């Protein structure tokens, strides 16, 4: 699993269980939006028999979404999750918390399922979190590059990253 440094990483830090070393990758602290998809593609090429997943937010995935075309062109069956909260969630929360206002963090996201299909990848939208498992089973069985969009309204499970511990 490759995680972009977005809101989903806060949730995964709290709830994701890693059972094997070197199976969860996060460029934490570097602000490298767009990291997950190209990294996952490279890992899938290196380990073709292991499912590889990229976890992105809707804003961060726009930095490297074109790499999905590369996965299609070379038949690299990577799984791309896009958690769509219509913006830069980490920065949104940071601005709300520190300044009480927002600037440049709310965006209008494209139709990610349609975009994936336009690249020749498989695309599915999951509007009910109880259906995520079904979507994962579906994309694992078709063995082609796939995008799973999950519309959401994330709230951070914890806010330690922005707490001023000196107070």
Specify the residue positions occupied by each region the protein language model found.
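Active-site pocket-lining segments that scaffold enzyme catalytic pockets across diverse folds
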Residues: 1-7
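Thiamine diphosphate
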Residues: 11-167
């Amino acid at each position: 699993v490759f995680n972009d440094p977005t809101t989903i990483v806060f949730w995964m830090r709290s709830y994701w269980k890693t059972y094997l070393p070197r199976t969860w990758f996060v460029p934490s602290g570097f602000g490298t939006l767009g990291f997950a998809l190209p990294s996952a593609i490279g890992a899938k090429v290196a380990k073709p028999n292991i499912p590889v997943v990229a976890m992105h937010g809707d804003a961060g995935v726009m930095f490297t979404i074109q790499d999905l075309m590369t996965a299609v062109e070379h038949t690299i069956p990577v799984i791309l999750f896009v958690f769509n909260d219509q913006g830069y969630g980490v920065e949104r929360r940071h601005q709300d918390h520190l300044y009480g206002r927002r600037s440049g963090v709310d965006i209008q996201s494209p139709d990610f399922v349609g975009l994936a299909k336009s690249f020749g990848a498989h695309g599915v939208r999951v509007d009910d979190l109880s259906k995520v498992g079904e979507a994962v089973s579906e994309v694992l069985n078709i063995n082609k590059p796939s995008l799973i969009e999950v519309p959401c309204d994330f709230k951070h499970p914890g806010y330690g990253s922005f707490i001023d511990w000196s107070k």
